[in-house]
Amino acid sequence: MKKEKKYFGTDGIRDQVGKGLICPDKILKLGWATGKVIKDHGESVVMIGKDTRISGYMFESALEAGFIAAGVDVMLLGPMPTPAVAYLTQTFHADAGIVISASHNPHHDNGIKFFSAKGQKISDAIEHEIEAAYEQDLSIVSSSDLGRAKRIDDAAGRYIEFCKSTYEGAKKLDGFKIVLDCAQGATYHIAPMVFKELGAEVVAIGVEPDGININQNCGATDLAQLQARVVAEKADFGIAFDGDGDRVMMVDAQGDVVDGDEILYILATGTNLPIKGVAGTLMSNLGLENALKEKGIELVRTQVGDRYVMEALREKGWVLGAESSGHVLCLNKTTTGDGIVAALQVVSIMVNSGKTLTELRQGMTKYPQILQNVRVESKVGLNTNAALKKAVQDSEERMGGKGRVLIRASGTEPLIRVMVEGDSRSMIESEVKSLVELVKTEFC
């Protein structure tokens, strides 16, 4: 049985600023604890990046102080997408990469993500070591052994060149008009340059971060602005990233959303690589599974969370996986979810096939799916609640085997997510309504 973790969630540590570990004094100690673990493993250099939220500067300073107190050298990247930190950690031969971000969450949240020297999410074992070190009293190394900090000035340029190198189109993007929504986040100074330098005409929105507006009515979790702009600009398609750049969603020329499931379908069926199977999650649409099956491609489902998709891919020796929400893994190109790189793979397929995004998505028909989030006081007992178990069973029986229900707790927010999928929208609307009411009764 796995040992429970005290601080780490499904994607690092995350909370509202000023709550839990997301306070300057505690982040300083977290930096020290992580530094202590790094030193215990005989290593001594970390790289720190962040998204654009206002609290990032405060936590960057706190982490820097903690690592230096532990005798670990620090390289500061400034605002940089999460996947860029993973990539640069490898190319600079750092021993770990740290990202200060709450991903798609609002500005009042923040968090810490951790990468190994190989640019991969750290293991459960290392997370347990960090938690154990955090419980110890902080002690500072001698003055002569303190770590040193420096800023890396050419990081953005290095990452832009890497992204461009993953593009496999037979020709440049001259003639394409693309709208990019950078979510007022970490891709704001990266993504437009990548696509412009590949030859596209770029209309960029969400590129004026002020520390507060990250993910606010924009980006991969709120596509309305992008959809309207793609249609108004008569663009070929649009691409949206989330606040830290590890998610991607797309919009076709008609303004219709192309989500993570459809992106995975396009990648799996459009690549020249031999694809035996791909990894999705419990949330992946039944339409994806059916469409892939017709192509002889297996879909393996995991728990929700890109780390679980990654684990499945490593276990199977496969390279493609995705969550519906837009975490897309292309392990033939990167070590972690990378919104810019994933989008470039789709664009490569468009260019090489001569097909539009609308045409590429047509091989997959999505089942109607409704996902509703319920903010709750506590998620305790969700998996053992008898009333909820019976309600789920009754709901699936009413749908006659042509639908499914998934109720799960968010790993990063005080939410219970209710998802119902089936071949009739009116039916699933009715089922969602009754299940949400029950969740509110039992947990609010």
From Swiss-Prot:
Binds 1 Mg(2+) ion per subunit. GO terms for biological process: carbohydrate metabolic process; peptidoglycan biosynthetic process; UDP-N-acetylglucosamine biosynthetic process. Mg(2+) binds at S103, D242, D244, D246. It holds the Pfam family PGM_PMM_IV. The lineage of its organism: Bacteria, Pseudomonadati, Pseudomonadota, Gammaproteobacteria, Thiotrichales. The modification Phosphoserine is found at S103. Catalyzes the conversion of glucosamine-6-phosphate to glucosamine-1-phosphate. This is Phosphoglucosamine mutase. Its cofactor is Mg(2+). Transmembrane segments: none annotated. HAMAP family: GlmM_B. It is an enzyme of class 5 (isomerase). Activated by phosphorylation. The keyword Isomerase applies. It catalyses: alpha-D-glucosamine 1-phosphate = D-glucosamine 6-phosphate. Gene3D superfamilies: Alpha-D-Glucose-1,6-Bisphosphate, subunit A, domain 3, Alpha-D-phosphohexomutase, C-terminal domain. PANTHER family: PHOSPHOGLUCOMUTASE (ALPHA-D-GLUCOSE-1,6-BISPHOSPHATE-DEPENDENT), PHOSPHOHEXOSE MUTASE. Keywords: Isomerase, Magnesium, Metal-binding, Phosphoprotein. NCBIfam families: glmM (TIGR01455), PRK10887.1 (NF008139). Signal peptide: none annotated. InterPro entries: A-D-PHexomutase_a/b/a-I (IPR005844), A-D-PHexomutase_a/b/a-I/II/III (IPR016055), A-D-PHexomutase_a/b/a-II (IPR005845), A-D-PHexomutase_a/b/a-III (IPR005846), A-D-PHexomutase_C (IPR005843), A-D-PHexomutase_C_sf (IPR036900), A-D-PHexomutase_CS (IPR016066), Alpha-D-phosphohexomutase_SF (IPR005841). Its EC number is 5.4.2.10. The active site is at S103 (phosphoserine intermediate). One of its GO terms (cellular component) is cytosol. Belongs to the phosphohexose mutase family.
